[in-house]
């Protein structure tokens, strides 16, 4: 049995599609020769320690966990293999000793998507060079919240922009954060990488549309749902790598000996239909660098 521990919402397809593909590539198919025990925190990260403890008590063969969930799993067991996926630095987060030789019972995939915040600021500036203030939506309970906030603010200040921090760790707080946008008079919104936001693309896109705020997201899935643009790695690709590592561990390999995989592939996705609705025109230079343009 595999434990799948996640801070986001139940059954978010891009997570599971890639993960199942990775498992299948190693010869494992859910419901045939492997079972999964899913635990979704629905953005309530304070539930993760109990969920992790429950999976550990069930003696699952391996635990799959994203950043906040991996921290809970790490506290729950020092023996069950844990395969993480994180947008941050796994060494700085305390998950591993080194990238090549993780050492303990954790290994996984690092996308470094948290480090792309400054690039998102630059992309917004390229699209909207006249704006003087932007908003940053983050989850204050995230381990990466402080570092992400700092790097985004530094990048914005370099471009002469101020940054208003909007905090949300529940659905209600997401709605409240968007409601504040009009009073803040910001020209654009940046949504950070976080399981709470990653598993709610439709909700975030609908709110951005309602408030007519140009928004840049960390994942392609938000743009497919109608968001303006995204810059980041592929969730499906990351979880495919995770699934492959889980399969290898089930075959007997040790997480301590499996180097952390770093996904450096990033993609810029633009939605021209949404841009037209907002009355925006993307510069040719920006369109030319896009990996995908949705019309």
Please place each PLM-identified region on the residue numbering.
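Short hydrophobic alpha-helices and adjacent helix-cap/hinge residues
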Residues: 1-295
């Amino acid at each position: 049995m595999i434990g799948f521990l996640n801070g986001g919402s139940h059954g978010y397809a891009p997570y599971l599609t890639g993960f199942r593909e990775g498992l299948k590539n190693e010869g494992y198919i859910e419901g045939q020769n492997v079972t999964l025990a899913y635990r979704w925190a629905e953005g309530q990260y304070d539930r993760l320690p109990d969920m992790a403890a429950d999976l550990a008590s069930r003696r699952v063969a391996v635990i799959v966990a994203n950043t906040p969930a991996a921290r809970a799993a790490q506290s729950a067991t020092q023996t069950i293999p844990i395969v993480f996926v994180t947008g941050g630095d796994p060494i700085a987060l305390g998950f591993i000793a080194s990238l090549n030789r993780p050492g303990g019972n954790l290994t996984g995939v690092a996308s470094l998507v948290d480090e792309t915040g400054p690039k998102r600021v630059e992309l917004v500036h390229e699209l909207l060079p006249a704006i003087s203030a932007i908003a940053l939506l983050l989850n204050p309970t995230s381990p990466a919240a402080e570092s992400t906030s700092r790097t985004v603010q530094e990048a914005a200040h370099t471009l002469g922009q101020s940054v208003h921090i909007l905090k949300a760790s529940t659905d209600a707080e997401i709605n409240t954060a968007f409601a504040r946008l009009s009073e803040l008079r910001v020209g654009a919104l940046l949504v950070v990488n976080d399981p709470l936001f990653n598993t709610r693309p439709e909700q975030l896109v609908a709110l951005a549309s309602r408030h007519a705020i140009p928004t840049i997201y960390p994942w392609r899935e938000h743009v497919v749902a109608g968001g303006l643009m995204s810059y980041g790695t592929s969730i499906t690709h990351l979880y495919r790598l995770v699934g492959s590592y889980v399969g290898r561990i089930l075959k007997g390999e040790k997480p301590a000996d499996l180097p952390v995989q770093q996904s450096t592939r990033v993609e810029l996705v633009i939605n021209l239909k949404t841009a037209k609705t907002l009355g925006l025109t993307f510069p040719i230079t920006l369109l030319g660098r896009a990996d995908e343009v949705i019309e």
